[in-house]
Amino acid sequence: MIPQTLEQLLSQAQSIAGLTFGELADELHIPVPIDLKRDKGWVGMLLERALGATAGSKAEQDFSHLGVELKTLPINAEGYPLETTFVSLAPLVQNSGVKWENSHVRHKLSCVLWMPIEGSRHIPLRERHIGAPIFWKPTAEQERQLKQDWEELMDLIVLGKLDQITARIGEVMQLRPKGANSRAVTKGIGKNGEIIDTLPLGFYLRKEFTAQILNAFLETKSL
């Protein structure tokens, strides 16, 4: 069922909280892989199916009619994020005139339904649990941080300084190669403004940033 309101979406997300991947997959008649080595997107696909997401692999939000993006957040036993969170691919060409306000990153992060999931590898995939959903919109300070990082990183792209980009740049968001392997290439802008072959780059939220979102949610629950 495709949720028609935010309330319906949240209700559906709350209804699967506490289930294991195996329980939910059996309900939906979806086979469970032994691990995620060859099926990295399996958990996201499972939750998209359970919640009625509509975007598939398109660039729009997962629940575009509600303006909501779905993000899984693997956490460890202490409740800390285990990995960075992919947001979107960076526009390496045809990016003149792109501003933060009309960027894919801002669009994707304007409203997110976070689904924390058990991610510790010693727990068999079937037995990992789904956590309580978190509806999140960036605070003014978070938006400022995201905008600052995006502008700094996009400046390097537009000015042809791809070779200067490292994962260390960015307070809350970083740029990293995004591709199944190092042979994946795309077009980018070189030092002299020429078009070059380069690795696709993706914007990723740092673990410290998503931990902040989790902690803020837990604080409201403990009040």
Curated annotation (Swiss-Prot):
It holds the Pfam family MutH. The keyword DNA damage applies. It comes from the Bacteria. GO terms for molecular function: DNA binding; endonuclease activity. SMART domains: MutH. Keywords: Cytoplasm, DNA damage, DNA repair, Endonuclease, Hydrolase, Nuclease. GO terms for cellular component: cytoplasm. One of its GO terms (biological process) is DNA modification. SUPFAM superfamilies: Restriction endonuclease-like. It is found in: Cytoplasm. Its main location: cytoplasm. Belongs to the MutH family. Sequence-specific endonuclease that cleaves unmethylated GATC sequences. It is involved in DNA mismatch repair. HAMAP family: MutH (MF_00759). This is DNA mismatch repair protein MutH. It comes from Haemophilus influenzae (strain ATCC 51907 / DSM 11121 / KW20 / Rd). The gene is mutH.
